[in-house]
Amino acid sequence: MAGYLPEPLRMMVTNPAISDFTSDGPLPYALRQKFTGWPPPPAAADISLASQTVLVTGATSGVGLEAARQLAQLGPRLLILGARNLSKADGVKRQLEQDTPHVAVQVAKLDLEDLSSVDRFVDGLHASAIHLDLALLNAGFFANDDRMTPDGYSSLFQVNFLSTAYLAFRLLPLLQTTTTAPEASPQGPRLVLVTSEAHAWTTFPVPPEPAENSLPILSSFRQKESLGSADDQYYRAKLLLALIGKELSRRLTTMQMATSVVITTPGFCASNFFPDSVMTRLIQLISARSIQQGGALHVFAATAQGPQMHGAYLRDGKPTGLSKFAEGPQGQILQQRLWVEMEQFLAGRGYLLSSILKPSSPLQIDGPV
């Protein structure tokens, strides 16, 4: 019967955490959307991205598009859109340049179902001598299927975690060599990872410590017969993304590096994230946040200043803890094991963390790239 229900109702009805009535549970989550998560909207007079270079992924529709629109209104010198569908991205570019003619918008191909596409995207930024002040990694998706990518991973896992985390690591050198203009990036460069409150609706068996060339966490998403439901693949991918963001922020702090990492979620918004239906529209009307509110939460995560922001997980626009599992002893072990696996994964693709995670002297950029 549940299989005939539209999303996200089916996801709620079949949720294994349905009996969790803490703030992490799915029912409190659904009830909270209309009444919380209203950070003050950024005003150009208070927040300016002048002289900054901003990257947004997943900006051709939904919350990502709205976040890109709101960020453009804050006046960055260059707004880069990483997108799989270049035709849609070009349409967004034209609209943004019409609405904010003082902002240069650049579009580049980025398909998170293809790790080589991530490499080509970042290599293109390097070739253009682009240095980032802000990277908002918003791209993600949900589909109730078990599609695999050409790289051999579950599509849900690769898009929502692996390629996003890989992109984040590869962007770090570009964030660390940012502009030095006085008005640019007073908070320092920032990396924003978009997870989901759904990370709290799952756990993850802690694997044995990985041996050399053994990646038990990542490899578990290559075996179709053991993937589990699409829902749980999505939940676990978002859990892993939150954990890698936490560990990355901790290590950047230890190394006294300038880049701040913020983990955020826009909550349930009235977007095209789920397939369209009359019931879905009704559910959105009753309990979803608006696209504008979701975009504002992204912009808040990208621009809010203060020492409490680095390493923060923002829910409803406020710093809070991750799920009980993520913050507990098993989650902390998983976080460390995941870091080791990502280090090996990067090395397998020719990138050593020791060369990525090192302070670089800021570079002066005289004009738009």
Swiss-Prot record:
<feature type="active site" description="Lowers pKa of active site Tyr">
    <location>
        <position position="238"/>
    </location>
</feature>
<dbReference type="GO" id="GO:0016491">
    <property type="term" value="F:oxidoreductase activity"/>
</dbReference>
<feature type="binding site">
    <location>
        <position position="88"/>
    </location>
    <ligand>
        <name>NADP(+)</name>
    </ligand>
</feature>
<dbReference type="InterPro" id="IPR036291">
    <property type="entry name" value="NAD(P)-bd_dom_sf"/>
</dbReference>
<feature type="binding site">
    <location>
        <position position="238"/>
    </location>
    <ligand>
        <name>NADP(+)</name>
    </ligand>
</feature>
<keyword id="KW-0521">NADP</keyword>
<comment type="pathway">
    <text>Antifungal biosynthesis.</text>
</comment>
<dbReference type="InterPro" id="IPR002347">
    <property type="entry name" value="SDR_fam"/>
</dbReference>
<comment type="similarity">
    <text>Belongs to the short-chain dehydrogenases/reductases (SDR) family.</text>
</comment>
<dbReference type="Pfam" id="PF00106">
    <property type="entry name" value="adh_short"/>
</dbReference>
<protein>
    <recommendedName>
        <fullName>Short chain dehydrogenase rstn4</fullName>
        <ecNumber>1.1.1.-</ecNumber>
    </recommendedName>
</protein>
<feature type="binding site">
    <location>
        <position position="138"/>
    </location>
    <ligand>
        <name>NADP(+)</name>
    </ligand>
</feature>
<comment type="function">
    <text>Short chain dehydrogenase; part of the gene cluster that mediates the biosynthesis of the tetrahydropyranyl antifungal agent restricticin that acts as an inhibitor of CYP51 and blocks the ergosterol biosynthesis. The highly reducing polyketide synthase rstn3, the short chain dehydrogenase rstn4, the cyclase rstn5, the FAD-dependent monooxygenase rstn6 and the enoylreductase rstn7 are required to generate the first stable intermediate desmethylrestrictinol.</text>
</comment>
<feature type="active site" description="Proton donor">
    <location>
        <position position="234"/>
    </location>
</feature>
<feature type="binding site">
    <location>
        <position position="111"/>
    </location>
    <ligand>
        <name>NADP(+)</name>
    </ligand>
</feature>
<keyword id="KW-0560">Oxidoreductase</keyword>
<feature type="binding site">
    <location>
        <position position="234"/>
    </location>
    <ligand>
        <name>NADP(+)</name>
    </ligand>
</feature>
